[in-house]
């Protein structure tokens, strides 16, 4: 990427201490004030004698290594071991307070857990668009400003309570969004590694601050590595062949670490090629090789326990913890706030000789160095000790700017948008998301909320806005007793019971359709959502929420027209998720609503009556309006989240029907689609004139929407993911991580025509690209390809254009991407103006992983340079010749890792040993792996393979040429080796093999191959 994206023009954010601050008061409530909270270092050291400031580890003039060594020398063995836990022991005698890793800050300061009781504490802090929305700005400079605000607010909370609010932030998430069915799609940035790493680097730089040594906060990249599924996420293995691993998955992490925009990684729950990610040696071997800075690597919550429990990888926690430390993990997030089990397990590992004290000391030093860089042990708290401001005017303005910049205009037929406020009389703002803002699992509490209705009313005046949610209000009457189901009348709500004689508001419920049969019920009496509370059901929740969302239902119709209710909360596919044997609801003898039936036939039948027809209300409002804005979409706690993947991408049927009805009533209908992931909305694309997409964009959502709808801002967000026409365009399984082999994402998928391509987005103006120039048409490794293009705003309004540079390698030994993003720039162009945009790509970035030699290679080839407005909208093109290498024929006389195949079928990748190595494993008889273009010109006498075979009885290993069923040139029996990780050499005599050949190893079921080589 160009240096422009590296670092960093600041726009509009002065030092936050210059603004009026909302200072923290005891109890974490907010009060208006201008005072800056006391710095954390002063607070932590308050109980320490003054002479402690004279200790060497508190001397900022010493090197960090000297300070770490001095402090480690003063700690007891137990205190040192405790540094390997999320909540290490405080050391009052040295003035060291409670440290904690892990404050959530994905798109604003969000929440933390208490060291005292493990309880969750939520921050009231500036809330920005979800991460996928921040990336949709395609504006690293803006995202860096967001990171700056988040780190300022983290410092403010830390100053108020340093024991509770740590400065090691668990953000950003850089897992690539290769499949929109992933429940945590909203947390990531893009399906593209270049865009993801650029946005993550920008956010990370905002979080870390500008000091060359000290850190404002310490961001941690999540989740290393190959983590894209919630279903059984702690036992699923991400199968990553070398090219998918090195070219795709690692490239979301590596550039961020190299840019010093993160201080470590969090490991995923999953396994990587059969080995738990928490114990993968690449944490040390690979991740630490990307930087000369010390990294602090942490586990995800409770993941260390999985190695013994769900994964059954080790028999004891001592073995597991020893493996984690040796692999490069520094901190274990486990057993909530109690470090003692970790202390005991690590001490046990030391006693057994599974760990050396130097291993523990190294991990502990990583913890301490991070804290030194955060200024914790400096007498004055370091340069960021007095930074801290929350919800200032500047922060609010940035929240609005980022929410506006993230919006993507998907359709705009006939210039439907922008609406002219001078000629637009009344606007109907309808839909289930018209007058509410939803938070998500990794969002904090919004200081205030501007809904779409609020924003549009502020722009036009309240009298010019008619609004309704467009949802039905129903009653549910027990078909047997005739009594109505009702909740509590007060603001606190109350238990639901079928005891009401008449359908007053306590017996009326608004039904919100979220798709796939799932609904929520909101009480008309108090506006609270109905949920399960273990003793029954009550109308007492502000909105659906919680780790296992307990406010979800299915209303199932019986043949006689009555309905039954099925509880759909706690709907998770995690291995530890609870389940309910009796999910259907019954009315107990006392009238209370309870779980109690296994089947619909056993459930209580209710007569459902519609009190208010929501669609009819919306239609009536639309008929009287000059324009209708229908706000529909998803709810982050329902339509996929952590612990819950999606199966479909459709908009809820009830919401789509609402849009169609409003469109029929008012042709001037605009859809605002609010969602956290791509949706299959082909029907809307065909039926409405304008569609504007936004993520759940935080406290300023309504103002941002009004800015765009009325033309105060030109929409210039661009999609960071491909939007498919159908879920059928996606792979059969979410578990296929081989984007190269299975041709996933815009990079490789040339078989499907997307609804909206990667990089897509419309504008209120138009742009012409011209005069593409390439600085040098012939380049070599170490050079940089530099291009420039003129972009002219040919419309009548000023606007932003996101200029995108893609490349395509014309010739290669290996499959190459159809196109690949290399650089981009979001530029502002006034109406009639032409600007010259400069883009670049280092030639070394045109590399790919050579499986024949197990290393990076830049091939000799011509590369197409494609400049345009999206991955498919190419406006200018040129080419450049790269003077690189030519990959020679495979030399199989060298020891070859079996995983470095060109093609395979019926196999998976597994761990060679628990400590390191990757092997190919056959999952059926006749499985095969192919090694193409092997040089056998000197002949081959035998193939020697390192193999393992668990279970009883032998299996076969065959060597064939040309195809899996091609000419057989050798075979041998693979004996049972007694264990899947017990390898032995097997020699296969080879006959009549010469020339350049595609070599196939055909494997019997259960055979594992680590390495092999030919003898000649």
Can you annotate each of these PLM segments?
Residues 2-8, 27, 31-849, 862-866, ...:
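Glycoside hydrolase catalytic-domain context in secreted enzymes
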Residues 854:
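Extracellular/periplasmic metallocenter environments
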Residues 860-864, 871-877, 881-1016:
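Extracytoplasmic
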Residues 16-27:
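Bacterial N-terminal signal peptides
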Residues 778, 828, 857, 935-936:
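Residue-level "contact hotspot" at macromolecular interaction interfaces
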